[in-house]
Design a protein with these regions (language model features):
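Conserved RNase H-like, two-metal-ion catalytic cores of nucleic-acid enzymes
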Residues: 1-99
Length: 99
């Protein structure tokens, strides 16, 4: 299932889905590779598991994305953690570190 988040109902459905998981994959899509460029930005963020993916427009759903990183107490799996976490940090989103 691929779900593009477009409505508040989609957000509610996402958080319900998230509550059933203890581990999720996270990926970002950005405007380029260089996080130090003046016009660099995150465009999309995807959250998923082996069967489902949720796609968020970063600018539109920024508050929901911040809430996701604050509320979710499970494990984040990043394809390229160094880059994605740096890109999110550049946008003011802190990814919590857990041991």
């Amino acid at each position: 299932m691929l779900k593009t988040v477009e409505t508040v109902d989609d957000v509610v459905e996402f958080f319900h889905w998230l509550s059933t998981h203890d581990r999720v994959a996270v990926d970002t899509e950005t405007t380029g590779k260089n996080v130090y460029e003046f016009n660099f930005g995150v465009r999309l963020i995807q959250v998923g598991d082996t069967h489902s993916a949720w796609v968020f427009n970063f600018k539109r759903w920024r508050g929901v994305i911040e809430e996701f990183f604050t509320r979710f107490k499970g494990e984040f799996i990043f394809h390229n953690a160094n880059y994605d976490i740096h890109a999110l940090h550049r946008e003011g989103i802190e990814v919590p570190w857990r041991q």
